[in-house]
Amino acid sequence: MLNDVGHLDCYVQHLTQICAEHPIHIEVDICNGQGAVIVPKGRHFDLALAERLSEHTLQEPLENCIQLDELVDAQKLMQLFKAVIETDQNIALFHERWQLNSLLAKSCEFYGQFPLLMQKMTVLKYEMPHLFKQALFCAYTSLAIARRLKANRDECVCVFLAGLIHDIGILHLDLELVTKKDEYTPEQWQAMQSHTQLGAKILKRIPNMPPSIIKAILEHHERYDGSGYPRAKKGMELGTMGQIIGMADTCLALYKRDLHSKKLGFDALLPILQLNPGIYCDKVFKAIVGLIKDIPWPMKRLYSDESMPKVVSRLLLTNEGITHDYSVLYGLVVSINPHLPKNKKSAMLRNMTQRIHFCLQRSGILQREHKEWMRAQKKEDYAAIERLEIMYAEIRWQMKQLRKLLAILWKKHQLKHPQLNQEIQKGLWQIEQYHRNHIGAKVH
């Protein structure tokens, strides 16, 4: 697939990055828009050829005309899963409890029926190994959830494949965006969200691709409460498969962000998941909670008793920041709500705000009693206090997404009255200044 003539498509750029170490050859004649052969089959693909092809409109997308000499095929994929199970303690505990070997083998065989997917997953492995590993985890977790829900074998293998390929649209995003190390701007965050639609578009061109998988790829960032994207769909509008993939993806994102560096088990996810039970449909939520609770996870402390006073001081400062941001953001949304246009971004904003509001009310972390409980610093409460670090990180992340959404509405002048746009600008500036002024006050 090429962009405008004269420019290398993002996916083709990935191919040019890997072709020196991982040979690619032309499997069928490449023809221009008029049907004339411009590159015969059998030739090796390289940067010079890619640049030459970029000057032409092709009859078939380039990805349909090439073959990677070393593919992550069904057999290789199964080997990679075995390696993950042997080396990752959390997945090993899951695997020992749920015995998914037979279903896993069938699922890998199903994946092997789609040559273009094998090509793209191979490129993902070489170009974005961290994302490829996440794809393995997401596929495995999705399969476990489907099994827990008593899905039949055909449904299970489809859920597995959707979990494996849910992020292939990222291969077609601008490389500068994908490789960015620091935080996305609101505009870049919005551009990244298009990977769901790109992924679904790719799958629609693949023969015999089950429609349920295409729908799941499109919906895996939608949320049951309407706070997701790309269409802010909610409730019964959403398919179960997309909810399963979304739940697995969320668990792995939370684990990578908040738990992996602390070497905690998946059981540490439970307090975070229970903050937002309405994000996913009830049966999917209960399935993942059941999967986690059925495993005897080893209990682990993060800090020594002697260091807990500093931990509590740091948490109290974090709590203060959450209270401040919530007050500003909630006040902003209440103020602009009657004037919001009727579109998907406005629906997302309302639903996300409501979710955060209920989350904070349910958790009780803004209550005086919560802070007094922390200040009491009873040794028997230390383990629970430690886990607040994870809960606070999730709440702060959710509020950061809300800030980005408000920034998009402001920068795109979605509000007709200039005073309302000024209110958003002022509120976002106020939050930024608060955190800038309090950096030095943090206790390490």
Task: Give the ranges of each region predicted by the language model.
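Acidic/His-rich, divalent-metal-binding segments that scaffold phosphate/diphosphate chemistry
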Residues: E63-Q193, Q197-S212, L302, W410-K411, ...
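Histidine/acidic-rich helix-loop-helix segments that form or flank divalent-metal centers
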Residues: G163, K204-G246, H260-L264, L270-I390, ...
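Amphipathic alpha-helix face/heptad-repeat signature
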Residues: L131-A135, Q188, T240, T318, ...
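Membrane-cytosol interface segments
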Residues: M1-W98, L366-H444
